[in-house]
């Protein structure tokens, strides 16, 4: 799977275009002499949480609950364009709806079924969560898996 672009209907969220190979999300501190200006709050973690949500993470995590509340309040739609096995897909999600290539999925379970077709014989979320971690508990779980 190759991520191509993460975007939002909210103009405050600048689209993120992914390049071939490894992509690293970092914050840039512009004023080096101002100790109060940090890279906190510029959207690094939010970008990862958005990708996780778009790729089927359930609402049990507090990060996803916060994100869904924001999407509902601001009427925002997130979009992720990705490629898998030579096919390009465009996923869009609001707080309660999902579209895949402009086809509406009323239920999350139907949407998850599609994601599972990408990795036949496995659960997409099970595989994805091994490599993609957005909260502290998931880091702790990774340590448990290797120890």
Residue ranges and their predicted role:
Residues 1-87:
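Extreme N-terminal "head/tail" segments of very large remodeling/mechanoenzyme assemblies
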Residues 84-96:
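Hydrophobic or amphipathic alpha-helical targeting/insertion segments
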């Amino acid at each position: 799977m190759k991520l191509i672009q993460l975007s939002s209907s909210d103009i405050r969220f600048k689209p993120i275009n992914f390049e071939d190979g490894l992509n690293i999300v970092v914050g840039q501190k512009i004023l080096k002499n101002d100790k109060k200006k940090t890279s906190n709050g510029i959207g690094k973690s939010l970008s990862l949480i958005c990708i996780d949500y778009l790729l089927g993470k359930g609402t049990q995590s507090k990060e996803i609950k916060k994100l869904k509340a924001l999407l509902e309040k601001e009427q925002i739609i997130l979009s992720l364009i990705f490629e898998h096995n030579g096919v390009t897909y465009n996923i869009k999600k609001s707080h309660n709806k999902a579209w895949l290539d402009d086809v509406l999925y009323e239920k999350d379970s139907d949407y998850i079924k599609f994601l599972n077709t990408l990795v036949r014989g496995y659960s997409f979320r099970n595989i994805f969560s091994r490599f993609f971690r957005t909260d502290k508990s998931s880091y702790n779980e990774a340590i448990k898996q290797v120890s």
